[in-house]
Amino acid sequence: MFVATNRLFVPAERAEEFEEHFRSNMRTFLPGVPGLRRSTLLRPTRPDQPYVSVNEFDTEEDFKAWVASASFKEAHRRNAGIARHVTGNAVETFQPSEDLVLTES
């Protein structure tokens, strides 16, 4: 598994419209992306925290292929509607060190 996150700083007064645009882009451009297991937009619980977009891929190569794809470019071209809500962002990538899944029996 390979994980890419994007920390998106959005002023509270722009949050609702930001979420609408971001969710629309997720639903439009992410289904069918090869190797993409899951995409989650996390809402902050405090006004000083950013939104966090979390994308889980099978491999780093799948992530890189997505970033180079026409779908990625089109989604980010459409992000002009989102960008006006974001005051800053930070992309980070990770490979799991441990993945513990707990379920009830």
Region annotations inferred by a language model:
Residues 24-36, 56-92:
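An amphipathic, aromatic/His-enriched active-site/gating alpha helix that lines ligand/cofactor pockets
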Residues 10-12, 59, 95-98:
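Non-catalytic surface loops within mature trypsin-like serine protease
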Residues 2-5, 15, 27:
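Short acidic/polar alpha-helix capping motifs at helix-coil junctions
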Residues 9-22:
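Short, surface-exposed ligand-recognition loops at beta-strand->loop->(often short) alpha-helix junctions
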Residues 2, 40-49, 77-105:
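Glycine-rich beta-strand-turn "strand-cap" elements at beta-sheet edges
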Residues 2-9, 40-69:
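Short, well-ordered beta-strand segments in beta-rich or mixed alpha/beta enzyme
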